Amino acid sequence: MKDIERRILLGRVVGAFGVRGEIKLESWTEPRSAIFRYQPWIVRSPSGVETTIEGVRGRDSGKHLVARFPGVEDRDTVEAMRGTEIYVARSALPPPKPDEYYWVDLEGLDVKTTEGVALGQVSHLFSTGANDVVVVRGDRERMIPFVQPDFVKSVDFEANLVVVDWDPEF
């Protein structure tokens, strides 16, 4: 696996919830409330100031995730935090299940076809709802459905390689 001590962006502060210092969060975890399981948080303000926070509590209010940061007691403090990004160390995440991957672990891997044709490297992934899509950048950008075993034949972190069944001309 790649550098497991790198930071993973899990969410951001989107605004205040009420007047007593509660914080509305946007989370990119699945499920979204899982963001509270992974701590400590490394928060980076829009100006680049980083702070480590432990003991964050939160809940899913239906429309938003709502959190309490230690020491944050009023709406003005929260509003000044708008746009703050929430990170954790990669090592804070549990190991993925067999044949499951964290997207961040796939980024940067080389991609080759089953015939050995190099297509480029994994740039990023996104979800369509039906399946995830891996974006490969090389001589051009390709979007390949991350569907195993139909299109993605293997992922080998030791070899830094994803093998796909894909027409290099497509």
UniProtKB/Swiss-Prot annotation:
It is found in: Cytoplasm. One of its GO terms (biological process) is rRNA processing. Keywords: Chaperone, Cytoplasm, Ribosome biogenesis, rRNA processing. InterPro entries: PRC_barrel-like_sf, PRC_RimM, RimM, RimM_N, RimM_N_sf, Transl_B-barrel_sf. One of its GO terms (cellular component) is ribosome. Pfam families: PRC_RimM, RimM. Disulfide bonds: none annotated. One of its GO terms (molecular function) is ribosome binding. Residues 97-170 form the PRC barrel domain. The PRC barrel domain binds ribosomal protein uS19. An accessory protein needed during the final step in the assembly of 30S ribosomal subunit, possibly for assembly of the head region. Essential for efficient processing of 16S rRNA. May be needed both before and after RbfA during the maturation of 16S rRNA. It has affinity for free ribosomal 30S subunits but not for 70S ribosomes. Binds ribosomal protein uS19. Belongs to the RimM family. This is Ribosome maturation factor RimM. It comes from Stenotrophomonas maltophilia (strain K279a). The gene is rimM.
